[in-house]
């Protein structure tokens, strides 16, 4: 699996390990990382932007298309 880095766009796919109020599914941007979690900035169910720590297992990288 590719390493998720700061600045990457990710899809929020679950809430298994870290409590967060982000909408699922939704997209968010990674603003910080540590060994088990990523801090993402994205929209919650109420339409307000939140920054939350989310477990790596709860996010899926959104890969950019490669232009040949």
Where are these regions (language model features)?
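Basic/aromatic-rich interaction segments and small domains that mediate binding to polyanionic partners
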Residues: 3, 9-68
């Amino acid at each position: 699996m590719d390493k998720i880095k700061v600045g990457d766009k990710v899809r929020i796919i679950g809430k298994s390990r870290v409590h967060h109020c982000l909408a699922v599914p939704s997209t968010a941007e990674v603003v910080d990382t540590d060994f088990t979690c990523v801090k993402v900035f994205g929209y919650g169910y109420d339409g307000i932007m939140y920054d939350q720590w989310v477990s790596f297992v709860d996010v899926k990288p959104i890969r950019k298309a490669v232009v040949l």
